[in-house]
Protein backbone atom coordinates (compact mmCIF):
# COMPACT_ATOMS: atom_id res chain seq x y z
CA UNK A 1 0.00 0.00 0.00
CA UNK A 2 2.94 2.31 0.75
CA UNK A 3 4.27 1.86 -2.79
CA UNK A 4 0.81 2.62 -4.20
CA UNK A 5 0.58 6.03 -2.51
CA UNK A 6 4.25 6.78 -3.20
CA UNK A 7 3.70 6.05 -6.90
CA UNK A 8 0.71 8.41 -7.01
CA UNK A 9 2.70 11.12 -5.20
CA UNK A 10 5.70 10.95 -7.53
CA UNK A 11 3.45 10.87 -10.59
CA UNK A 12 1.70 14.05 -9.38
CA UNK A 13 5.08 15.71 -8.73
CA UNK A 14 6.34 14.68 -12.19
CA UNK A 15 3.26 15.80 -14.11
CA UNK A 16 3.05 19.07 -12.15
CA UNK A 17 6.65 20.02 -12.99
CA UNK A 18 6.35 19.13 -16.68
CA UNK A 19 2.90 20.68 -17.19
CA UNK A 20 3.96 23.90 -15.43
CA UNK A 21 6.91 24.32 -17.80
CA UNK A 22 4.80 23.41 -20.84
CA UNK A 23 2.01 25.86 -20.06
CA UNK A 24 4.47 28.57 -19.03
CA UNK A 25 5.98 28.31 -22.52
CA UNK A 26 2.57 29.09 -24.05
CA UNK A 27 1.93 31.84 -21.48
CA UNK A 28 5.28 33.60 -21.82
CA UNK A 29 5.26 33.76 -25.63
CA UNK A 30 1.57 34.78 -25.68
CA UNK A 31 2.35 37.72 -23.39
CA UNK A 32 5.36 38.67 -25.56
CA UNK A 33 3.04 38.67 -28.60
CA UNK A 34 0.53 40.97 -26.86
CA UNK A 35 -2.15 38.33 -26.22
CA UNK A 36 -4.23 38.68 -23.07
CA UNK A 37 -4.11 35.48 -21.00
CA UNK A 38 -7.32 34.92 -19.03
CA UNK A 39 -6.30 31.83 -17.06
CA UNK A 40 -3.15 29.82 -16.36
CA UNK A 41 -4.20 26.52 -14.79
CA UNK A 42 -2.16 23.59 -13.50
CA UNK A 43 -4.65 20.76 -13.10
CA UNK A 44 -8.34 20.56 -13.97
CA UNK A 45 -11.58 20.67 -12.03
CA UNK A 46 -12.42 22.66 -8.90
CA UNK A 47 -9.75 25.29 -8.11
CA UNK A 48 -7.85 24.53 -4.89
CA UNK A 49 -6.01 27.85 -5.10
CA UNK A 50 -6.28 30.90 -7.34
CA UNK A 51 -4.83 34.37 -7.60
CA UNK A 52 -5.34 37.15 -10.15
CA UNK A 53 -2.37 39.15 -11.41
CA UNK A 54 -2.30 42.86 -12.26
CA UNK A 55 -2.50 41.95 -15.97
CA UNK A 56 -5.83 40.20 -15.37
CA UNK A 57 -4.55 36.60 -15.60
CA UNK A 58 -6.06 34.17 -13.09
CA UNK A 59 -3.47 31.66 -11.88
CA UNK A 60 -5.12 28.42 -10.71
CA UNK A 61 -4.18 25.06 -9.20
CA UNK A 62 -6.92 22.53 -10.03
CA UNK A 63 -8.04 19.52 -8.03
CA UNK A 64 -7.18 16.97 -10.76
CA UNK A 65 -3.39 17.12 -11.34
CA UNK A 66 -3.34 15.40 -14.73
CA UNK A 67 -2.66 18.31 -17.06
CA UNK A 68 -3.16 22.02 -17.43
CA UNK A 69 -4.07 24.76 -19.87
CA UNK A 70 -3.63 28.42 -20.78
CA UNK A 71 -6.86 30.19 -21.75
CA UNK A 72 -6.34 33.22 -23.98
CA UNK A 73 -8.68 35.99 -25.11
CA UNK A 74 -10.29 34.77 -28.35
CA UNK A 75 -13.24 36.17 -30.31
CA UNK A 76 -14.22 32.65 -31.41
CA UNK A 77 -14.94 31.67 -27.81
CA UNK A 78 -16.52 34.78 -26.28
CA UNK A 79 -17.45 38.38 -27.00
CA UNK A 80 -14.47 40.73 -26.90
CA UNK A 81 -14.70 44.47 -26.38
CA UNK A 82 -13.44 46.76 -29.12
CA UNK A 83 -10.71 48.04 -26.79
CA UNK A 84 -9.32 44.52 -26.26
CA UNK A 85 -9.61 43.12 -29.78
CA UNK A 86 -5.94 43.77 -30.51
CA UNK A 87 -5.12 41.44 -27.55
CA UNK A 88 -7.19 38.52 -28.91
CA UNK A 89 -5.31 35.38 -29.97
CA UNK A 90 -7.27 35.04 -33.21
CA UNK A 91 -6.26 38.59 -34.25
CA UNK A 92 -2.55 37.75 -34.22
CA UNK A 93 -0.59 36.85 -37.35
CA UNK A 94 -0.15 33.21 -38.33
CA UNK A 95 3.52 33.30 -37.36
CA UNK A 96 2.69 34.70 -33.92
CA UNK A 97 0.09 31.97 -33.37
CA UNK A 98 2.62 29.35 -34.49
CA UNK A 99 5.15 30.74 -32.00
CA UNK A 100 2.62 30.68 -29.13
CA UNK A 101 1.53 27.09 -29.83
CA UNK A 102 5.05 25.76 -30.46
CA UNK A 103 6.32 27.36 -27.24
CA UNK A 104 4.79 24.62 -25.05
CA UNK A 105 6.65 21.65 -26.59
CA UNK A 106 9.77 23.81 -26.93
CA UNK A 107 9.63 24.57 -23.18
CA UNK A 108 9.57 20.82 -22.47
CA UNK A 109 12.52 20.29 -24.81
CA UNK A 110 14.47 23.03 -23.00
CA UNK A 111 13.50 21.52 -19.63
CA UNK A 112 14.84 18.16 -20.79
CA UNK A 113 18.12 19.84 -21.71
CA UNK A 114 18.27 21.69 -18.38
CA UNK A 115 17.60 18.52 -16.39
CA UNK A 116 20.31 16.64 -18.30
CA UNK A 117 22.73 19.49 -17.62
CA UNK A 118 21.99 19.18 -13.88
CA UNK A 119 22.41 15.41 -14.17
CA UNK A 120 25.84 15.70 -15.81
CA UNK A 121 26.93 18.13 -13.08
CA UNK A 122 25.73 16.11 -10.05
CA UNK A 123 26.19 12.66 -11.64
CA UNK A 124 23.85 9.66 -11.89
CA UNK A 125 24.84 6.58 -9.91
CA UNK A 126 24.47 3.35 -11.83
CA UNK A 127 26.04 -0.04 -12.42
CA UNK A 128 28.70 -0.56 -15.07
CA UNK A 129 27.91 -2.77 -18.06
CA UNK A 130 29.97 -5.63 -16.62
CA UNK A 131 28.93 -9.12 -17.71
CA UNK A 132 28.36 -11.56 -14.86
CA UNK A 133 27.54 -14.54 -17.04
CA UNK A 134 27.57 -15.06 -20.81
CA UNK A 135 25.45 -17.70 -22.52
CA UNK A 136 23.80 -18.40 -25.90
CA UNK A 137 24.58 -15.68 -28.49
CA UNK A 138 26.83 -13.76 -26.08
CA UNK A 139 29.01 -16.82 -25.45
CA UNK A 140 29.11 -17.57 -29.19
CA UNK A 141 30.35 -14.00 -29.78
CA UNK A 142 33.27 -14.63 -27.42
CA UNK A 143 32.03 -12.55 -24.50
CA UNK A 144 33.12 -13.80 -21.06
CA UNK A 145 32.17 -13.12 -17.42
CA UNK A 146 34.03 -10.05 -16.17
CA UNK A 147 34.02 -8.30 -19.56
CA UNK A 148 32.88 -4.67 -19.34
CA UNK A 149 31.09 -3.30 -22.40
CA UNK A 150 32.43 0.18 -23.25
CA UNK A 151 30.77 0.82 -26.63
CA UNK A 152 28.06 -0.63 -28.87
CA UNK A 153 28.17 0.15 -32.59
CA UNK A 154 30.56 3.02 -31.89
CA UNK A 155 28.37 4.63 -29.23
CA UNK A 156 30.00 4.99 -25.83
CA UNK A 157 28.46 3.02 -22.97
CA UNK A 158 28.97 3.85 -19.29
CA UNK A 159 26.25 1.76 -17.65
CA UNK A 160 24.23 -1.44 -18.00
CA UNK A 161 21.05 0.59 -18.64
CA UNK A 162 22.63 2.32 -21.66
CA UNK A 163 23.94 -1.02 -22.97
CA UNK A 164 20.53 -2.67 -22.56
CA UNK A 165 18.80 0.17 -24.42
CA UNK A 166 21.23 0.05 -27.36
CA UNK A 167 21.08 -3.75 -27.63
CA UNK A 168 17.28 -3.62 -27.58
CA UNK A 169 17.21 -1.01 -30.36
CA UNK A 170 19.62 -3.04 -32.51
CA UNK A 171 17.60 -6.24 -31.95
CA UNK A 172 14.35 -4.53 -32.96
CA UNK A 173 16.07 -3.27 -36.12
CA UNK A 174 17.17 -6.89 -36.84
CA UNK A 175 20.80 -5.72 -36.88
CA UNK A 176 23.91 -7.31 -35.43
CA UNK A 177 25.78 -5.27 -32.82
CA UNK A 178 29.52 -4.70 -32.52
CA UNK A 179 30.58 -4.59 -28.87
CA UNK A 180 33.86 -3.14 -27.61
CA UNK A 181 34.80 -4.62 -24.25
CA UNK A 182 37.53 -4.45 -21.61
CA UNK A 183 38.32 -7.77 -19.95
CA UNK A 184 38.88 -8.27 -16.19
CA UNK A 185 42.66 -7.81 -16.69
CA UNK A 186 42.41 -4.75 -18.93
CA UNK A 187 42.55 -6.56 -22.27
CA UNK A 188 40.52 -4.87 -25.01
CA UNK A 189 38.58 -6.71 -27.72
CA UNK A 190 35.72 -6.40 -30.20
CA UNK A 191 32.87 -8.87 -30.63
CA UNK A 192 29.93 -9.13 -33.03
CA UNK A 193 26.70 -10.10 -31.32
CA UNK A 194 24.51 -11.75 -33.97
CA UNK A 195 21.16 -10.30 -32.89
CA UNK A 196 19.70 -11.21 -36.28
CA UNK A 197 19.65 -14.83 -35.02
CA UNK A 198 17.09 -14.00 -32.33
CA UNK A 199 13.93 -15.99 -32.92
CA UNK A 200 11.02 -13.75 -33.98
CA UNK A 201 8.92 -12.49 -32.34
CA UNK A 202 10.71 -11.81 -29.05
CA UNK A 203 9.99 -9.84 -25.90
CA UNK A 204 11.77 -6.48 -26.32
CA UNK A 205 11.82 -6.04 -22.53
CA UNK A 206 14.24 -8.97 -22.05
CA UNK A 207 16.65 -8.74 -24.98
CA UNK A 208 19.83 -8.96 -22.86
CA UNK A 209 18.60 -12.14 -21.18
CA UNK A 210 17.56 -13.61 -24.54
CA UNK A 211 21.04 -13.08 -26.02
CA UNK A 212 22.60 -14.57 -22.88
CA UNK A 213 23.97 -11.52 -21.06
CA UNK A 214 23.46 -11.49 -17.30
CA UNK A 215 24.76 -8.30 -15.69
CA UNK A 216 27.18 -8.82 -12.83
CA UNK A 217 25.35 -6.64 -10.31
CA UNK A 218 22.17 -8.70 -10.78
CA UNK A 219 23.89 -11.97 -9.93
CA UNK A 220 23.78 -12.27 -6.15
CA UNK A 221 23.41 -15.53 -4.17
CA UNK A 222 19.79 -15.91 -2.96
CA UNK A 223 18.94 -15.61 0.73
CA UNK A 224 16.56 -18.07 2.40
CA UNK A 225 13.53 -16.12 3.61
CA UNK A 226 11.20 -18.89 4.80
CA UNK A 227 11.12 -22.66 5.36
CA UNK A 228 7.92 -24.54 4.50
CA UNK A 229 6.72 -26.68 7.47
CA UNK A 230 7.16 -30.39 6.82
CA UNK A 231 9.51 -29.85 3.87
CA UNK A 232 12.84 -31.62 3.42
CA UNK A 233 14.59 -28.31 4.12
CA UNK A 234 13.06 -28.07 7.61
CA UNK A 235 15.69 -28.65 10.26
CA UNK A 236 18.54 -28.41 7.77
CA UNK A 237 18.24 -24.95 6.25
CA UNK A 238 17.43 -21.81 8.27
CA UNK A 239 16.08 -18.38 7.33
CA UNK A 240 19.00 -16.07 6.60
CA UNK A 241 21.15 -18.81 5.06
CA UNK A 242 22.78 -17.79 1.78
CA UNK A 243 22.83 -20.43 -0.98
CA UNK A 244 26.26 -20.52 -2.61
CA UNK A 245 26.20 -23.60 -4.85
CA UNK A 246 24.27 -26.76 -5.75
CA UNK A 247 26.26 -29.88 -6.68
CA UNK A 248 29.35 -27.78 -7.31
CA UNK A 249 27.56 -25.32 -9.61
CA UNK A 250 27.70 -21.73 -8.36
CA UNK A 251 24.29 -20.25 -7.47
CA UNK A 252 24.14 -16.60 -8.50
CA UNK A 253 20.42 -15.88 -8.48
CA UNK A 254 17.02 -17.17 -7.42
CA UNK A 255 16.54 -18.33 -11.01
CA UNK A 256 19.79 -20.31 -10.78
CA UNK A 257 18.58 -22.06 -7.63
CA UNK A 258 15.26 -22.97 -9.24
CA UNK A 259 16.94 -24.44 -12.34
CA UNK A 260 19.50 -26.34 -10.26
CA UNK A 261 16.78 -27.89 -8.06
CA UNK A 262 14.84 -28.98 -11.16
CA UNK A 263 17.98 -30.65 -12.55
CA UNK A 264 18.56 -32.45 -9.24
CA UNK A 265 15.00 -33.75 -9.30
CA UNK A 266 15.25 -34.92 -12.91
CA UNK A 267 18.58 -36.65 -12.25
CA UNK A 268 16.97 -38.51 -9.34
CA UNK A 269 19.77 -38.33 -6.79
CA UNK A 270 20.52 -36.24 -3.66
CA UNK A 271 22.49 -33.05 -4.19
CA UNK A 272 25.02 -31.13 -2.11
CA UNK A 273 23.65 -27.69 -1.20
CA UNK A 274 26.40 -25.31 -0.09
CA UNK A 275 25.25 -22.49 2.18
CA UNK A 276 26.77 -19.72 4.25
CA UNK A 277 25.34 -19.26 7.74
CA UNK A 278 26.95 -16.27 9.38
CA UNK A 279 30.70 -16.90 9.16
CA UNK A 280 30.21 -20.65 8.73
CA UNK A 281 30.12 -22.50 5.40
CA UNK A 282 28.07 -25.72 5.34
CA UNK A 283 27.37 -28.51 2.84
CA UNK A 284 23.99 -30.25 3.13
CA UNK A 285 22.83 -33.33 1.24
CA UNK A 286 19.18 -32.95 0.22
CA UNK A 287 16.80 -34.55 -2.29
CA UNK A 288 14.04 -32.35 -3.75
CA UNK A 289 10.45 -33.59 -3.75
CA UNK A 290 8.07 -33.37 -6.68
CA UNK A 291 4.92 -31.28 -6.18
CA UNK A 292 1.46 -32.10 -7.53
CA UNK A 293 2.18 -29.63 -10.35
CA UNK A 294 5.30 -31.57 -11.36
CA UNK A 295 7.78 -29.02 -9.98
CA UNK A 296 10.73 -30.17 -7.89
CA UNK A 297 10.91 -28.35 -4.52
CA UNK A 298 13.19 -28.04 -1.50
CA UNK A 299 10.50 -26.27 0.49
CA UNK A 300 12.16 -22.87 0.80
CA UNK A 301 11.27 -19.33 -0.22
CA UNK A 302 14.08 -16.98 -1.13
CA UNK A 303 14.81 -13.30 -1.50
CA UNK A 304 17.37 -11.83 -3.90
CA UNK A 305 20.78 -11.28 -2.38
CA UNK A 306 21.91 -7.86 -1.14
CA UNK A 307 22.11 -5.25 -3.90
CA UNK A 308 25.75 -4.19 -4.40
CA UNK A 309 26.89 -0.58 -4.28
CA UNK A 310 26.77 1.46 -7.50
CA UNK A 311 30.08 1.33 -9.37
CA UNK A 312 29.50 3.86 -12.16
CA UNK A 313 29.12 7.63 -11.83
CA UNK A 314 30.36 10.39 -14.10
CA UNK A 315 30.41 14.08 -13.18
CA UNK A 316 31.38 17.10 -15.26
CA UNK A 317 32.05 20.77 -14.70
CA UNK A 318 29.29 23.36 -15.05
CA UNK A 319 30.51 24.54 -18.48
CA UNK A 320 31.63 21.13 -19.76
CA UNK A 321 28.15 19.75 -19.04
CA UNK A 322 26.43 22.21 -21.44
CA UNK A 323 27.44 20.61 -24.79
CA UNK A 324 26.97 17.15 -23.26
CA UNK A 325 23.38 18.01 -22.28
CA UNK A 326 22.64 19.37 -25.77
CA UNK A 327 24.15 16.29 -27.43
CA UNK A 328 22.32 13.89 -25.11
CA UNK A 329 19.01 15.65 -25.78
CA UNK A 330 19.59 15.12 -29.49
CA UNK A 331 20.44 11.45 -28.97
CA UNK A 332 17.41 10.87 -26.75
CA UNK A 333 15.17 12.58 -29.32
CA UNK A 334 16.53 10.35 -32.09
CA UNK A 335 16.06 7.25 -29.89
CA UNK A 336 12.47 8.22 -29.03
CA UNK A 337 11.56 8.92 -32.66
CA UNK A 338 13.23 5.66 -33.65
CA UNK A 339 11.12 3.71 -31.17
CA UNK A 340 7.94 5.41 -32.41
CA UNK A 341 8.87 4.52 -35.99
CA UNK A 342 9.42 0.88 -34.98
CA UNK A 343 6.02 0.71 -33.28
CA UNK A 344 4.28 2.25 -36.32
CA UNK A 345 6.07 -0.10 -38.77
CA UNK A 346 5.53 -3.16 -36.57
CA UNK A 347 9.23 -3.72 -35.75
CA UNK A 348 8.40 -3.14 -32.08
CA UNK A 349 5.33 -4.18 -30.14
CA UNK A 350 2.60 -1.67 -29.26
CA UNK A 351 3.01 -3.04 -25.71
CA UNK A 352 5.84 -0.50 -25.39
CA UNK A 353 3.23 2.30 -25.13
CA UNK A 354 2.85 3.06 -21.42
CA UNK A 355 0.01 4.76 -19.56
CA UNK A 356 -0.24 6.62 -16.25
CA UNK A 357 -0.05 3.45 -14.14
CA UNK A 358 3.32 2.46 -15.61
CA UNK A 359 4.54 6.06 -15.44
CA UNK A 360 3.58 6.24 -11.75
CA UNK A 361 5.47 3.02 -10.99
CA UNK A 362 8.56 4.18 -12.88
CA UNK A 363 8.42 7.58 -11.16
CA UNK A 364 8.38 5.90 -7.75
CA UNK A 365 11.14 3.43 -8.67
CA UNK A 366 13.40 6.19 -10.00
CA UNK A 367 12.81 8.37 -6.92
CA UNK A 368 13.80 5.42 -4.71
CA UNK A 369 17.07 4.99 -6.60
CA UNK A 370 18.15 8.57 -5.97
CA UNK A 371 17.99 12.17 -7.14
CA UNK A 372 19.99 11.50 -10.30
CA UNK A 373 17.65 8.74 -11.45
CA UNK A 374 14.56 10.86 -10.80
CA UNK A 375 16.05 13.77 -12.75
CA UNK A 376 16.83 11.40 -15.63
CA UNK A 377 13.26 10.07 -15.53
CA UNK A 378 11.88 13.64 -15.62
CA UNK A 379 14.09 14.50 -18.60
CA UNK A 380 12.79 11.47 -20.53
CA UNK A 381 9.18 12.27 -19.64
CA UNK A 382 9.60 15.94 -20.57
CA UNK A 383 11.05 14.98 -23.95
CA UNK A 384 8.22 12.49 -24.53
CA UNK A 385 5.65 15.18 -23.72
CA UNK A 386 7.30 17.54 -26.21
CA UNK A 387 7.35 14.94 -28.99
CA UNK A 388 3.80 13.66 -28.40
CA UNK A 389 2.41 17.20 -28.32
CA UNK A 390 3.94 17.83 -31.74
CA UNK A 391 2.04 14.94 -33.32
CA UNK A 392 -0.14 16.45 -36.12
CA UNK A 393 -3.32 15.40 -34.32
CA UNK A 394 -6.03 18.04 -33.80
CA UNK A 395 -6.45 18.86 -30.07
CA UNK A 396 -2.67 18.53 -29.57
CA UNK A 397 -0.29 21.43 -30.25
CA UNK A 398 0.90 19.65 -33.39
CA UNK A 399 -2.66 19.62 -34.73
CA UNK A 400 -2.95 23.39 -34.32
CA UNK A 401 0.42 23.83 -36.04
CA UNK A 402 -0.93 21.72 -38.92
CA UNK A 403 -3.95 24.05 -39.20
CA UNK A 404 -1.66 27.10 -39.31
CA UNK A 405 0.60 25.46 -41.93
CA UNK A 406 -2.48 24.89 -44.12
CA UNK A 407 -3.52 28.52 -43.52
CA UNK A 408 -0.10 29.70 -44.72
CA UNK A 409 -0.39 27.57 -47.86
CA UNK A 410 -3.97 28.52 -48.82
CA UNK A 411 -3.82 32.11 -47.62
CA UNK A 412 -6.84 31.85 -45.33
CA UNK A 413 -7.84 29.91 -42.19
CA UNK A 414 -9.62 26.57 -42.40
CA UNK A 415 -13.38 26.79 -42.02
CA UNK A 416 -14.88 26.36 -38.57
CA UNK A 417 -16.59 23.20 -39.83
CA UNK A 418 -13.31 21.66 -41.05
CA UNK A 419 -11.56 22.45 -37.77
CA UNK A 420 -14.46 20.99 -35.77
CA UNK A 421 -14.29 17.78 -37.83
CA UNK A 422 -10.56 17.65 -37.18
CA UNK A 423 -11.16 18.00 -33.45
CA UNK A 424 -13.50 14.99 -33.47
CA UNK A 425 -10.96 12.93 -35.40
CA UNK A 426 -8.24 14.03 -32.98
CA UNK A 427 -10.40 13.09 -30.00
CA UNK A 428 -10.99 9.62 -31.44
CA UNK A 429 -7.28 9.07 -32.15
CA UNK A 430 -6.27 10.32 -28.71
CA UNK A 431 -8.92 8.19 -27.00
CA UNK A 432 -7.67 5.14 -28.89
CA UNK A 433 -4.06 5.85 -27.92
CA UNK A 434 -4.98 6.37 -24.27
CA UNK A 435 -7.11 3.21 -24.31
CA UNK A 436 -4.16 1.21 -25.64
CA UNK A 437 -1.87 2.70 -22.98
CA UNK A 438 -4.33 1.81 -20.19
CA UNK A 439 -4.73 -1.70 -21.64
CA UNK A 440 -0.96 -2.20 -21.62
CA UNK A 441 -0.81 -0.91 -18.04
CA UNK A 442 -3.44 -3.39 -16.89
CA UNK A 443 -1.75 -6.29 -18.71
CA UNK A 444 1.60 -5.28 -17.23
Swiss-Prot record:
CDD domains given in the database record: S2P-M50_PDZ_RseP-like
Catalytic residue list: 23
Residue ranges occupied by any PDZ domain in the UniProt entry: 192-276
One GO BP: proteolysis
Binding site for Zn(2+): 22, 26
Membrane topology, from the record: Multi-pass membrane protein
InterPro entries: PDZ (IPR001478), PDZ_6 (IPR041489), PDZ_sf (IPR036034), Pept_M50_Zn (IPR004387), Peptidase_M50 (IPR008915)
First and last residue of the signal peptide: none
Listed transmembrane segments: 98-120, 371-393, 418-440
GO cellular component: plasma membrane
Molecular-function GO term, any one: metalloendopeptidase activity
Highest rank taxon of the organism: Bacteria
Subcellular location: Cell inner membrane
Keyword set, alphabetical order: Cell inner membrane, Cell membrane, Hydrolase, Membrane, Metal-binding, Metalloprotease, Protease, Transmembrane, Transmembrane helix, Zinc
Entry EC no(s): 3.4.24.-
Enzyme class: hydrolase
Pfam families: PDZ_6, Peptidase_M50
Cofactor: Zn(2+)
Family: Belongs to the peptidase M50B family.
NCBIfam families membership: RIP metalloprotease RseP (TIGR00054)
The protein's name in its UniProt record: Putative zinc metalloprotease XF_1047
Amino acid sequence: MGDFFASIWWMIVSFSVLVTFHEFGHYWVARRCGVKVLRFSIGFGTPLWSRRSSSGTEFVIGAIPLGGYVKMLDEREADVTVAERNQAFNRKSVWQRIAIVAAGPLANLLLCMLLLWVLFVIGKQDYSATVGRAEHLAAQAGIHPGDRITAIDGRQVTSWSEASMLLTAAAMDRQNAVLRVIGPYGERSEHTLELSKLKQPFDERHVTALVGINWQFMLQPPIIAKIEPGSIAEGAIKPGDIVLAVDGQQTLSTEDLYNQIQKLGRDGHPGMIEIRRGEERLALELSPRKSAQGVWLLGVKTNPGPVPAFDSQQRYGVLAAVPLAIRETGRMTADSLGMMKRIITGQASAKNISGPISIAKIANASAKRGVGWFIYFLSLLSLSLAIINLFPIPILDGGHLLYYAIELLKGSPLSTRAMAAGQYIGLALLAGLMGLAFYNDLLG
